[in-house]
């Protein structure tokens, strides 16, 4: 493990990428608390209002992910990530200014959320394929772990800062801080200056966009373990997005300590994410996806705990363990994904992965508020928790998921 860490730290491009991801996730930690309690503070707003804003961010991600995968493979992943972060920083900052000037409305925030979601649709497939361009393939698990560690330290710090800023000076400044982190991260990523395959002469002409999408689909669908996990996560993410984006803030406001308790719970979740990364640095399981999916049911139990609702201390414990489980999944999944899928198709296959995994997430966000208003927040959380537990367990019934092993001999990249 220490050898991997020393090797990675000597790679300048990896250090730059790690720094950028850590910084941007400080903003990502601020954003959920700031936007949720900012929207809920608007005159006449309720859980349904928050559903509209959060879903407006998720819908374009689902709509444009496949386009994002093709764009990333054509234009260069570092370039797409960098420019998406920079443009996104101004979009986010605009929302912050709307809150500060008293001009924030649900329709305006929905428009901004849609624009930012479109940029995220370009960002995700590009970032998913970026790491294998930066580090040797035999160090990918350690690299994913370290990026996850930086990501989660940033998120945990951001959640703490976000709760403090929202509680003292309001959501507007926290959202502007979020935008600033994206601006710095985007500038850093553009410094990587990774050449595209067209620039290196590996290819002289891009195939058509349609043929690239078909090739990506073929690579995606031919790996049944990817398809099974993606289908299960379509339902898990539907529940989790509705939980974290709408139901948890509403439950905190109605039954617990508001933004302060939401910040504490997100802090515990981020700390668990860090713990999961540290555990993943030590693990070399023969069947990584058994480990990855084996802990995911705890996320559903976290939702059930919020439904009761338990004391914030208990919810922090559930959030912490859920964080461990989710980051173990992330590291194992990304390592298997990056080593079993051809490098030249990574962004496109990742786009199909992200599209399938998030296809129901807008419904979770759109419906969470109205259903909670109709049958109650706790009752809605019970339903979400049960669905998440069932789907997390279902993946392990597939033999391809259970039997997948790491590739013994990995080819180095320059």
Please give the residue ranges for each predicted region.
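Short, membrane-interfacial amphipathic segments enriched in basic
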Residues: 1-10, 200-211
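Helix-loop boundary and gating motifs at the non-cytosolic
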Residues: 3-59, 218-269
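Substrate-agnostic recognition of the 12-TM MFS/MFS-like secondary transporter fold
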Residues: 15-32, 54-70, 76-91, 108-167, ...
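Structural signal for membrane-spanning alpha-helices in multi-pass inner-membrane proteins
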Residues: 36, 92-99, 162, 166, ...
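Transmembrane alpha-helix termini and helix-breaking/packing motifs in multi-pass membrane transporters
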Residues: 36-43, 96-101, 157-177, 254-255, ...
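Helix-breaking motifs and short loop linkers at transmembrane-helix boundaries and internal kinks
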Residues: 44, 76, 98-99, 103, ...
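C-terminal transmembrane bundle of multi-pass solute transporters/carriers
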Residues: 53, 62-63, 74, 80, ...
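Helix-loop junctions on the cytosolic side of multi-pass membrane transporters
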Residues: 129, 133, 175-205, 397-410
